[in-house]
A protein has these predicted regions:
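Extracellular/periplasmic juxtamembrane segments that couple receptor/chemosensory ectodomains to their
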Residues: 128-131, 138-139, 143-146, 150, ...
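Extracytoplasmic/periplasmic sensory segments of membrane signal-transduction proteins
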Residues: 1-104
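Extracytoplasmic/periplasmic ligand-binding sensor regions of membrane-associated signaling proteins
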Residues: 67-149
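Tryptophan-centric aromatic hotspots in well-structured domains and transmembrane helices
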Residues: 27-40, 103-121, 237, 250
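Hydrophobic segments of polytopic membrane proteins
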Residues: 118-119, 174-178, 208-209
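Solvent-exposed, extracytoplasmic
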Residues: 11-16, 143, 147-190
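Solvent-exposed loop/turn segments at secondary-structure junctions
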Residues: 35-37, 124, 152-156
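Short, solvent-exposed loop/turn segments that connect beta-strands within catalytic domains
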Residues: 37-41, 110, 124-127, 139-143, ...
Length: 263
């Protein structure tokens, strides 16, 4: 019933909006195992729900950001006086969210065990790149009724993780899937990378050293460290927090230090 769905979305707007304002993310969403699009051939992929995002992100506090409706019933957006995204749709398409089927098939009782991240992926119907955290929604009896989660966009991550100047060179920050000895840049979120050649493409091969780790694609080399997180992507690859310094700037510092010591 579309009216019932819209009423439920309106009731859940306040906790969703409050979470968006308090959490470190660029969007927040939920999708229930129900749809108003029952006549469509792929109706099983659609989830009624609400997806709120920041629009025109600026390096400022959450309370000063504009919130728009990316997914949700038109009646919900109108009644809440929410601006609708120019790529708005009334429902979420679960088929376009990697791993959402695994989340909704979860049979445990501990929510943290049912959480999954996507790698860096294109937000449906937009040019933006995001990582999505998906969490199962359980009812009082422990049955999964859908999924909810948070979005981290590439712009949000970049604004939130600026370059950190140091004597060794500018320190860069990443959130990246690491598969064995390979850091998967194509699935990573990059902080501000001004002045470096680091892009979200390709693979950095990892070599452990005594004091630091080397990351290289054969042309560009970085020195740094990474810490595996208690999280994995939908296909089971661990996520890591990574800090890098371009090898060239570190070698310049090293050479300068040796000259100063000699003098």
């Amino acid at each position: 019933n579309p009216d019932t769905i819209a009423e439920l979305e309106k009731r859940l707007y306040t906790p969703l909006s409050n979470t968006l304002g308090a959490a470190s993310c660029s969007g927040i969403f939920f999708g229930l195992n129900v749809t108003a699009n029952t006549s469509l051939p792929n109706a099983e992929d659609f989830r009624a729900g609400l997806y709120l995002r920041y629009s025109g992100l600026q390096p400022t506090v959450a309370s000063e950001q504009d919130v728009i409706c990316f997914r949700g019933a038109a009646e919900t957006a109108r009644s809440l006086q929410l601006q609708m995204h120019n790529r708005w749709n009334p429902e979420l398409n679960a088929a376009l969210i990697p791993g959402s089927d695994q989340v909704t098939a979860y049979q445990g009782s501990r929510l943290a065990d049912g959480c999954l991240w996507t790698k860096r992926t294109e937000l449906p119907d937009t040019w933006e790149q995001v990582m999505l955290l998906c969490v199962p929604i359980l009812d009082g009896g422990g049955t999964v009724r859908g999924f909810c989660g948070a979005e981290i966009s590439d712009l949000y991550f970049s604004l939130s993780h600026n370059i950190v100047p140091s004597a060794f060179g500018n320190i860069l920050t990443l959130a990246a899937p690491i598969d064995g000895d390979s850091l998967l840049l194509s699935g990573a979120m990059l902080g501000a990378a001004d002045g470096s050649r680091l892009t979200a493409n390709g693979i950095l091969h990892i070599s452990d050293g005594k004091y630091y780790t080397t990351y290289s694609d054969g042309k560009n080399t970085y020195l740094g460290r990474h810490q595996l997180l208690d999280s994995a992507t939908w296909d089971g690859i661990p996520l890591a927090a990574v800090t890098l310094v371009p090898d060239g700037t570190f070698r310049s510092y090293e050479k300068g230090s040796q000259i100063a010591w000699f003098l």
